[in-house]
Amino acid sequence: MKREYSIDLVRITCCLFVVLGHCMLVSIHQSPVPVDPMFSVWVEQLVLFIRWVVPVFFIITGYCIAKKKTCTYSYCFLHVLKFIEVLFTVGLFFAIIELVFIERTLNGFTFVKALGKVVSGQLWDHMWFVYTVIGIYLVLPVIHCFLQQDIKSIITITTLLFIFTILIPYLDKWIHIGIRFPFEGVLFYVFFGGAVAKINTKKNWRYIYSLILALCMVYMVFFLKIDNWENIFHPVGCLMSMNLFLLWKEIYVKPSKVLLTLSGLSWGVYLIHPFFINVAVKGFRINLVGSLSWLKILIFFCTISLLSFGTVYILKKIPMVKQLF
């Protein structure tokens, strides 16, 4: 499979946006001082836009798997074991840290409680992605088989998934529709990525992608208080994620060692950045609001990003832990 450097750029960009979103949220939700209500509104609205880079990760998975000639269960099980290992090492560490922040003590019971949180999925919010990816990899060989069909079949399957996992659940708020498809919209995002890999999208469509993105953002602003934008399966937000990927994918990117290095570190940065955020806001109780709030958040974001990339770069040099990141 020929490497597409634009996908590496998309992966890095999405990772940085996730870090930025988390830095912005803690500024208002973990502030040691009262927060201006108007500032909170602005932060939450911007984070709602940023949130829609998360489905792009699933689209990338589908895009890359469709480019592979084969996808065996032995390959997928190795990845599943890796993610399970991440949960019971990195996830367990995060659970222990959180319990120490809450209980201000560390003992044998702390470890037992932390283990329970890993099993029950009660970790820091960003770890939901790890649990979801495990589920995706368990069915990835089946998805790969579908993505080897003709273009018409792939488009049909992807369209049906959009209707039954994205559109109908949304419309059900107003019109009860009895037909159900027992899968979440994550499966649609994976199939959409695979469909894009099989279809030659035209570069002169980037203006159309940009227009759709702009319309989605305008809609989100006007209907901010009506719809549940935190749900990553909202139809308008879904269109936003799809067009973000299509637009970014068309960017011409020159091969670069720095780009490949940062892309290889992105997964680890996604995993580890909340550790630095939580230590800063819960341990050192830093204040990101008040005067020059936006500048403080920007500096905080840059600091967390540099710490995360630097830490993961070092950790990947250690044989015993590099497979986790």
Model-assigned labels for residue ranges:
Residues 151, 156-199, 203:
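Long hydrophobic alpha-helical segments that form multi-pass transmembrane helix bundles
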Residues 1-163, 255, 287-325:
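Membrane-cytosol interface segments of multi-pass membrane proteins
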Residues 30-32, 100-105, 167-175, 220-228, ...:
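Juxtamembrane "helix-exit" motif on the non-cytosolic side of transmembrane helices
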Residues 183-187, 198-260, 268, 275-283, ...:
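Alpha-helical transmembrane segments and terminal signal-anchor/GPI-anchor hydrophobic tails
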Residues 42-55, 116-132, 169-189, 220-243:
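Interfacial loop-to-helix transition and helix-capping segments at the boundaries
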Residues 190, 194, 242, 246, ...:
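Transmembrane alpha-helical segments of multi-pass membrane transport proteins and ion-pumping complexes
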Residues 16, 20-23, 91, 158-172, ...:
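Aromatic-anchored segments of alpha-helical transmembrane domains
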